[in-house]
């Protein structure tokens, strides 16, 4: 048994090694080598000593690897193959191939090398095999036993193990036994044993201490970086660790997580957060646009848009992001004013996000706050001191330089040195570092740095005393030497030098206090003025695009996209393009390119882009001017071929517009005529206005149409005398007097005045048109009672006689009364009516222009919309109000005109009465003339005694005709005044009335009067025959 035990142990150990070779990295043998058991100790003691002391001998290592394994591997493989084989085995499978042998040998070499490496580590670490083997320090190769015991208690540093060390861990090893993933340094040095002297520190220990110091400095920097602001005290380690755990970077997130679930996208109820979450951002919006939109409310700490990275996020067609303000107050105002507002056609959805670290300096400062952080302009005084007057008003002119030293010292003592914190972080850190060493080392250090860094531009602030950086450096150094804290200082003005200027320290981070009320009002007042207009940079970009536009597809496409993206300012863009096309000196290719731009914008005006339809509306008002300017350019072209090419390109645009149906065909034909020079813009406007002023043909029909037929077709005695006068005289009376009669107005209202479709403007002039269409005069009504009495006395003979004589005398009457008097009256009435209608049309055009302007302002939002009314109802209400106002003015003018006419009539009637009283013998002369015997009337006794009323009427008509001819010859320019005087004569005779009828176009009455004397025998003969019967 004694012989078997060593051999058996040796055999078992060899089997263990051979199995380790085939087990791909098991660490059981490794554990046996480092920590042997009691049963194996006698058999393992012999090979361990030479392996430990002669590990550098290559031949010994090869013998150690090769000697026991090759002999044992073959019988083991054969036994395994025999145990699991079915049937006969081939001889080829019993022997390993050359490649397998090489791989097996390579594995054995790696295994042996790993064991030797572990034993090498164990020589310095200790014999405890359960712990991880790492480097601690160097030592002697053949160390004594006491030294090994001491090494076990020394501090340990984790070092990443080799790739073989991971394979030697057993599979059932717990995760707690694995080495930590962070660099941990034991700060306390383990105590030495009694009686052992302290050794001299090796290079490895010195390197370890240096690593400790670097790690401490790194931890300190992380603590400083984790603060919310440099003006707050440093936080504890637990706070910094919690912040680092709460705010993982976006880089560590999985790419599959949507942006909506990003850190900060949900309100956690933090009352101090200044971070706003934006949930609905236009994909075309970038960080710069967000800064300009949100920066109006205060300085911004950070702006971030979460750009889509996956197809799913791009399909949403909206982005999200975060905007962090420097203080809570500004963030609350931004949330209140921008939540739900439309920005670039997207409704802004805002909410609170998680707090983010606030940097010392904001990334965006509003222009209203920028002046507080900008340094003052150079003044020429030491340290760039500013006089008090110029500090209040930077635009004030510079004061003249002092003439003597006393004035200079006085100015300098009253000046103020304004300290501004530099915005460049590198320069600010260098200044702070310089101040730290100057305070510690003294002014000699500053002198040495100035001598050494005289050519370094970073240290220029030490030499240039008037720069803002030097002013800040000098103040900060003085403040630290006076006992101020680096984060808090006194803000009162003070004198640094005796009889020197006042120094004004910067405020304690003004960005953390928010914008003042004045700056808030300035930021909000600027917004309405820029509504619907381009910004300065956008206007400059548009002008630059138009200047460099060429007839290329890409250039025109880019310009069209710019126009559609800024469709809110469509009116300004259309004006700018129209102005660019009006310049005659512009080269023809640029003109064609700008016309193509107009065509592209009009084509895309029906696209689903916000406010794109405005271009069709605004271009419609400018296209006439555009093509008029193109016509001027076309006429200035000298070459025939070049002009034809230009013409063909323009006509191509017309054909395309006709296919697109952008505008109606009559409008396109009009534009084409303007371009070809067939129609001028001014003449086109005049021709458009004339038909509206005349309102068609009713005026001519009223003058020349129905009234003549009414007069010719009805017998004289069967119709009222008022109908015999016709339209012109009545219209003249109405033009003169302005007082229409109620009876005639009612009768005329039932007649159709217009024979074409009436326009909406005819409702305004309806009363005046009816008054002008009245065919009777108010003077006829005064004499109507007398005429009715005369007509009752007429007998049946006169009626039949008149009927027979009417047909025979038509031709004579037509020739007799087709005199220039009628034409003159017609022309005068027509001219006056056209003048009146022209004046009224001009007023109506002004009203319509006001209505159009009101509608444009209502649509663009400049005028508020009344609740409960649509746009059309509000426009109609405005038009009715203007028309009512104009009608009231017209009524006032009519009253004044009537008043003046009445005064003139009264004065003329008085004159006429005095004239009639002076001539009382006219009636007697008339009676004598009427009772004189005639050959025909002597045969009838009745006619001699009672003179005929018709003869009297004929005589009166002749006398009145002579008087009217005399008065007309004396007053040729005013025929209406003559007729008015004759009609308004208060004398007993009806001479004025007869004179008026003599000039009328009634052929029956005048014919009867002309025959009253010449055909008296014939008439008396007929009357006598009827009396006999």
Swiss-Prot record:
There is a cross-link at residues 80, 145, 168, 208, 748-749, 760, 822, 829, 832 (Glycyl lysine isopeptide (Lys-Gly) (interchain with G-Cter in SUMO2)). Residues 534-679 form the CID domain. Residues 55-64, 97-111, 144-155, 186-222, 239-249, 810-841, 874-922, 950-980 have a biased composition (Basic and acidic residues). GO terms for molecular function: RNA binding. One of its GO terms (cellular component) is U2 snRNP. The keyword Nucleus applies. Residues 1-111, 141-274, 778-841, 855-1029 are annotated as: Disordered. CDD domains: cwf21_SR140, RRM_SR140. Residues 45-54, 991-1029 have a biased composition (Basic residues). Residues 7-16, 169-178 have a biased composition (Polar residues). Pfam families: CID, cwf21, RRM_1, Surp. It is found in: Nucleus. The modification N6-acetyllysine is found at residue 760. Residues 274-355 form the RRM domain. Residues 786-806 have a biased composition (Acidic residues). Keywords: Acetylation, Coiled coil, Isopeptide bond, Nucleus, Phosphoprotein, RNA-binding, Ubl conjugation. The modification Phosphoserine is found at residues 67, 202, 236, 485, 788, 800, 811, 946, 948. Its main location: nucleus. SURP motif repeats lie at residues 430-473. InterPro entries: CID_dom, ENTH_VHS, mRNA_splic_Cwf21_dom, Nucleotide-bd_a/b_plait_sf, RBD_domain_sf, RRM_dom, SR-CTD_assoc_factor, SR140_cwf21. Residues 92-121, 192-232, 837-915 form a coiled coil. One of its GO terms (biological process) is RNA processing. Interacts with ERBB4. This is U2 snRNP-associated SURP motif-containing protein. It comes from Homo sapiens (Human). The lineage of its organism: Eukaryota, Metazoa, Chordata, Craniata, Vertebrata. The gene is U2SURP.
């Amino acid at each position: 048994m004694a012989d078997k035990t060593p051999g058996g142990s040796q055999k078992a150990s060899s089997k263990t090694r051979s199995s380790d070779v085939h087990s791909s990295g098991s660490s059981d043998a490794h554990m046996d080598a480092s920590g042997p058991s009691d049963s194996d100790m006698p058999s393992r003691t012999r090979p361990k000593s030479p392996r430990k002391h002669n590990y550098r001998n290559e031949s010994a290592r090869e013998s150690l690897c090769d000697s026991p394994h090759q002999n044992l591997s073959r019988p083991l493989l054969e036994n395994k193959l025999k145990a699991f084989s079915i049937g006969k085995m081939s001889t080829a499978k019993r022997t390993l191939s050359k490649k397998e042998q090489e791989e097996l040998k390579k594995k054995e070499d790696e295994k042996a090398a790993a064991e030797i490496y572990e034993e090498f580590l164990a020589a310095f670490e200790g014999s405890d095999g359960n712990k991880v083997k790492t480097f601690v320090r160097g030592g002697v190769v053949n160390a004594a036993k006491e030294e090994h015991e001491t090494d076990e208690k020394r501090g340990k540093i984790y070092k990443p193990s080799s790739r073989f060390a991971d394979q030697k861990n057993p599979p059932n090893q717990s995760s707690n036994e694995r080495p930590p993933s962070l660099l941990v340094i034991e700060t306390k040095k383990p105590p030495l044993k009694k009686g052992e002297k302290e050794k001299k520190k090796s290079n490895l220990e010195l390197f370890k201490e240096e690593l400790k110091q670097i790690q401490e400095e790194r931890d300190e920097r992380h603590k400083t970086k984790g603060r919310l602001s440099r003006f707050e005290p440093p936080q504890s380690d637990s706070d910094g660790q919690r912040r680092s755990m709460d705010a993982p970077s976006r880089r560590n997130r999985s790419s599959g997580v949507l942006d909506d679930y990003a850190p900060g996208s949900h309100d956690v109820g933090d009352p101090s957060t200044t971070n706003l979450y934006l949930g609905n951002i236009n994909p075309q919006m970038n960080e710069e646009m967000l800064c300009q939109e949100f920066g109006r409310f205060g300085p911004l700490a950070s702006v971030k848009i979460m750009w889509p990275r996956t197809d799913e996020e791009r399909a949403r067609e909206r982005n999200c992001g975060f905007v962090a303000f420097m203080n809570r107050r500004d963030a609350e105002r931004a949330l209140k004013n921008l939540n739900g507002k439309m920005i670039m056609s997207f409704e802004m959805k805002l909410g609170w996000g998680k707090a983010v670290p606030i940097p010392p300096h904001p990334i965006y400062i509003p222009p209203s706050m920028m002046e507080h952080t900008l340094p003052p302009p150079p003044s020429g005084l030491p340290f760039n001191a500013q006089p008090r007057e110029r500090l209040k008003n930077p635009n004030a002119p510079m004061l003249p330089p002092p003439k003597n030293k006393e004035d200079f010292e006085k100015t300098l003592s009253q000046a103020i040195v304004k300290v501004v914190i530099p915005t460049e972080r590198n320069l600010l850190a260098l200044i702070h570092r310089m101040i730290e060493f100057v305070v510690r080392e003294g002014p000699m250090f500053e002198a040495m740095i100035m001598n050494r860094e005289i050519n370094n531009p970073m240290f220029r602030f030490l030499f240039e005393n008037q720069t803002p950086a030097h002013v800040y450096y000098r103040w900060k150094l003085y403040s630290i030497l006076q006992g101020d804290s680096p984060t808090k200082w006194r803000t009162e003005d003070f004198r640094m030098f005796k009889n020197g200027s006042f120094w004004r320290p910067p405020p304690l981070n003004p960005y953390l206090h928010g914008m003042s009320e004045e700056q808030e009002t300035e930021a909000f007042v600027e917004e309405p003025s820029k509504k619907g207009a381009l910004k300065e940079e956008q206007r400059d970009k548009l002008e630059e695009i138009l200047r460099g536009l060429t007839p290329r597809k890409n250039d025109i496409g880019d310009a069209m996209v710019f126009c559609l993206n800024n469709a809110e300012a469509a009116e300004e863009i259309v004006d700018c393009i129209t102005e660019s096309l009006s310049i005659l000196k512009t080269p023809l290719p640029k003109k064609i390119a700008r016309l193509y731009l107009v065509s592209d914008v009009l084509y895309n005006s029906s696209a689903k882009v916000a406010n794109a339809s405005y271009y069709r509306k605004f271009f419609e008002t400018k296209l006439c001017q555009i093509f008029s300017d193109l016509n001027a350019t076309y006429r200035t072209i000298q070459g025939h071929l070049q002009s034809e090419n230009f013409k063909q390109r323009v006509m191509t645009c017309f054909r395309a517009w006709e296919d697109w149906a952008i505008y109606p065909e009559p409008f396109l034909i009009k534009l084409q005529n303007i371009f070809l020079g067939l129609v001028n813009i001014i003449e086109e406007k005049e021709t458009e206005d004339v038909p509206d002023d005349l309102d068609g043909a009713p005026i001519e029909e009223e003058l020349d149409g129905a009234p003549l037929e009414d007069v010719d077709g009805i017998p004289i005695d069967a119709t009222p005398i008022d109908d015999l006068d016709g339209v012109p005289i009545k219209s003249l009376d109405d033009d003169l007097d302005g007082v229409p009669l109620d009876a005639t107005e009612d009768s005329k209202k039932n007649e159709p005045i217009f024979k074409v479709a009436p326009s909406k403007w005819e409702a305004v002039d309806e009363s005046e048109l009816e008054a002008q269409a009245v065919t009777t005069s108010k003077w006829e009504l005064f004499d109507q009672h007398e005429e009715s009495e005369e007509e009752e006395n007429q007998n049946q003979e006169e009626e039949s006689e008149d009927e027979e004589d009417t047909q025979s005398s038509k031709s004579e009457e037509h020739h007799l009364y087709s005199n220039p008097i009628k034409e003159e009256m017609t022309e005068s009435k027509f001219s006056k009516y056209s003048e009146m209608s022209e004046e009224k049309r001009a007023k109506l055009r002004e009203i319509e222009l006001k209505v159009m302007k009101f509608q444009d302002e209502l649509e663009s939002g400049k005028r508020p919309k009344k609740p409960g009314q649509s746009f059309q109802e509000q426009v109609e209400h405005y038009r009715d109000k203007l028309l009512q106002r104009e009608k009231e003015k017209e009524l006032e003018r009519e009253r004044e005109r009537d008043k003046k006419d009445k005064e003139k009539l009264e004065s003329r009637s008085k004159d006429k009465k005095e004239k009639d009283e002076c001539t009382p013998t006219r009636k007697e002369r008339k009676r004598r003339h009427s009772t004189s015997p005639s050959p025909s009337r002597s045969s009838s006794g009745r006619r001699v005694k009672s003179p005929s009323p018709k003869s009297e009427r004929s005589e009166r008509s002749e006398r009145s005709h002579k008087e009217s001819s005399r008065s007309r010859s004396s007053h040729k320019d005013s025929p209406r005044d003559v007729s008015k005087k004759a009609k308004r004569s208060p004398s007993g005779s009806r001479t004025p009335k007869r004179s008026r009828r003599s000039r009328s176009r009634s052929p029956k009455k005048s014919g009867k009067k002309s025959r009253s004397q010449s055909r008296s025998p014939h008439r008396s003969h007929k009357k006598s025959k009827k009396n006999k019967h």
